[in-house]
């Protein structure tokens, strides 16, 4: 464990951020799986929105977000 006060704070912050990022990615995956189980316009919009949110927060690359959304759109159409 770190001895310097600022390093201790950063270590605690890293844990919190990791939990938050993991939850966000998990929610994205859940939305995608829900759409794939039952493709509908409403579930597509929810999945697309969650993908965009993850990309805007830097959890996934923007190109991956575009690729995932395109693949979902082909399943919808």
UniProtKB/Swiss-Prot annotation:
Source domain of life is Bacteria
Q: Which Gene Ontology molecular function entries are recorded, alphabetically?
A: small ribosomal subunit rRNA binding; structural constituent of ribosome
Q: Can you supply one Gene Ontology CC term for this chain's record?
A: cytosol
Record-linked Pfam families: Ribosomal_S20p
* The keyword Ribonucleoprotein is annotated on this UniProt entry: yes
Example GO biological process term?
translation
- InterPro entries hit by this protein: Ribosomal_bS20, Ribosomal_bS20_sf
Which key words are in the record? Ribonucleoprotein, Ribosomal protein, RNA-binding, rRNA-binding
Per the entry, what this protein does is: Binds directly to 16S ribosomal RNA.
Alphabetized PANTHER family for the sequence? 30S RIBOSOMAL PROTEIN S20, SMALL RIBOSOMAL SUBUNIT PROTEIN BS20C
The UniProt family comment states: Belongs to the bacterial ribosomal protein bS20 family.
Q: What is this protein's record name?
A: Small ribosomal subunit protein bS20
Q: Which organism is it from?
A: Streptococcus agalactiae serotype Ia (strain ATCC 27591 / A909 / CDC SS700)
Give the gene name. rpsT
């Amino acid at each position: 464990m770190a001895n310097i006060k600022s390093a201790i704070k950063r270590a605690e912050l890293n844990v919190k951020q990791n939990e938050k990022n993991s939850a966000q990615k998990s929610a994205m995956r859940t939305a995608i799986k829900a759409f794939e189980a039952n493709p509908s316009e409403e579930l597509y919009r929810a999945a697309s929105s969650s993908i965009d949110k993850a990309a805007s927060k830097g959890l996934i690359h923007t190109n991956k977000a575009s690729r995932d959304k395109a693949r979902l759109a082909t399943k919808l159409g």
